[in-house]
């Protein structure tokens, strides 16, 4: 049985009851709690919150050795900066209509639900000085609940995934929380996590696979901070990469690690902006390719990897510095090199059942569509690519001509 909030606890937080209640589901049962107005000076942010804990991974040094007041100010600014337009809109709404939706706080004054509203009220207090902005309306949980981290998490999830305002919760924050709770700390089994967050198990499994691949990617680039995944917005790519790596793990396990390396390098080099689509095309073509074409492609990718690997393994460089160095690799364009390798595989698959004559005719028809007058107007990157491709074409045509000459010479001798 969950106890009512004690008078002693209410007094400790200087709260006073208002004519409002809030329902919470705790340990599978629904309870109705009174709501209290609590001075914001008695409340603090929850550093174990999913969104805040992701931010903390990259910014923990900012709050090291800081006072509670300073920590609150730093986290407030981080929450506000993440989506200023939405926060300003919420601030205007609270200023005009008051705080309509109460939050939830622990017995020690830590806010576990309502971080955005708490942030808006703190900022309104500072910028408007209105008396109403001195208080945050919230349920106060008793000490028994406040000391049980799994109970707290379940309450957070119940509120987080049910509320309309949480639909824009960043996917990387969700992904990190799932990975942290199920894989790292094992606080929840996947089934328990699904029950707490109301996620379909199939969706959670897909999400967890993407989270595991994201962690592997971060390890690969030497970055232990999930916040970076949010910064570069890789969630959608990792979702796609995880799906296709699953195919190789199940169907072609002997090249699984190599394909993972190739896809991670694609995420780094970005031969095309839509990495997810690019990975999808690669997998589809690789499935159809003949063994000699697969081996040639893997060899090309291994050569690209040999250029990337020393940079990625250089611990003296930040991730951004690694990217800059890869982009300017000895005047070569690794993105173009990777793009050409994948496009070649695609073309080989498309024409692998044609004989040499038909392939050459097909190439000639494509070349007829090329507008040579547009060459001077190409961007520098495309000019470099065109020059490399033209040189490769010349070499290939020369080899074909030599074979034709050999054939004609042999025919004449006979």
Spans of model-derived segments:
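Short, charged/polar connector segments at secondary-structure boundaries
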Residues: 1-132
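An acidic, glycine-rich, mixed-charge low-complexity segment common to nucleic-acid enzymes
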Residues: 1-23, 34, 380-414
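Amphipathic, charge-rich alpha-helical segments that serve as recognition/docking helices
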Residues: 78-79, 132-215
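Amphipathic alpha-helical "recognition" segments
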Residues: 129-136, 201-271, 278
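Charged, long alpha-helical assembly modules
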Residues: 236-330, 334
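Charged/polar low-complexity intrinsically disordered segments, enriched in acidic residues
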Residues: 306-391
